């Protein structure tokens, strides 16, 4: 997979792309990057002040029309999912992309010591919300020229790791969800489904999981942008591989 080519600014003009967890970390950098290339990003987050901040940054630098969706994914249910779908439907001609990026770590703990409340919160935020958003938002993608659903993965999705608890389990389940959607959606629609493992990246979640690690030794989240541009480009149309892992030579 070679990403060493230039994307033309504006190639995402008039595309409407939802980014969950858009107010910080990887989601924030991806939202800014997609806006730079012309996308009207639907900014999801939990904190209104953080959403207002990235909204203001986008409209001050780019000629795009972002939308704010404030929602705690831990509390997302079918009624709220329908409400989000209605807001997007009323404000866009169609939905071109869903980037399921938002996630929480919960805590680093053995299974024996894991409390049920944290367990459920992690699974609700990382897994169940993705199921609900895909269920209610994919109908809005019918008229998109090149619709994409992108899940954010992790190394613990493919191999369980001690003390990663509910987070690892949620990511393994998300990987399975993406594979199921690939088989269910791709033969019947233009939708392509990808699962992307960004690797070790300088984020607050990474700092919490690895407190002794030097953050300056990690790549910045902005270095992931080329992958997301590729997902939405025609170059990904005939790609057979759907589980993509970060490779430094492509950034």
List the model feature ranges, each with a label:
Residues 191-196, 203, 211-251:
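C-terminal helical subdomain
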Residues 37-54:
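Conserved glycine-rich Rossmann-like NAD(P)H-binding loop of the short-chain dehydrogenase/reductase
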Residues 16, 23-25:
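Conserved glycine-rich cofactor-binding loop
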Residues 104, 142, 148-173, 178-187, ...:
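Catalytic loop of short-chain dehydrogenase/reductase
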Residues 84, 109-111, 118-120:
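Substrate-binding pocket helix/loop in short-chain dehydrogenase/reductase
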Residues 61-77:
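Rossmann-fold cofactor-recognition segment
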Residues 101-107:
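Conserved NAD(P)H cofactor-binding loop of Rossmann-fold oxidoreductase domains
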């Amino acid at each position: 997979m070679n990403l060493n080519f230039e994307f033309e600014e504006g190639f995402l003009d008039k595309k409407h792309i939802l980014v969950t967890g858009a107010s910080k970390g990887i989601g924030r950098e991806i939202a800014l990057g997609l806006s730079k290339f012309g996308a009207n990003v639907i900014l999801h987050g939990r904190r209104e002040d953080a959403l207002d901040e990235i909204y203001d940054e986008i409209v001050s630098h780019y000629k795009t029309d972002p939308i704010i969706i404030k929602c705690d994914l831990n509390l997302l249910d079918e009624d709220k999912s329908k409400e989000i779908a209605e807001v997007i439907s009323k404000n866009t001609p169609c939905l071109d992309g869903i980037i399921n990026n938002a996630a929480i770590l919960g805590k680093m703990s053995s299974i024996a010591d894991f409390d049920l409340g944290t367990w459920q919160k992690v699974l609700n935020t990382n897994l169940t919300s993705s199921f609900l958003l895909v269920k209610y938002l994919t109908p809005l993608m019918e008229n998109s020229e090149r619709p994409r659903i992108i899940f954010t993965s992790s190394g613990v999705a493919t191999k369980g790791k001690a003390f990663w608890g509910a987070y690892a389990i949620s990511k393994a389940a998300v990987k399975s969800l993406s594979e199921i959607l690939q088989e269910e959606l791709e033969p019947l629609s233009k939708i392509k489904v990808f699962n992307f493992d960004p690797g070790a990246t300088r984020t607050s979640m990474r700092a919490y999981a690895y407190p002794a690690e030097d953050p300056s030794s990690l790549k910045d989240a902005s270095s992931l942008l080329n992958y997301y541009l590729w997902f939405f480009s025609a170059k990904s149309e005939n790609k057979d591989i759907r589980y993509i892992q970060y490779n430094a030579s492509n950034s």
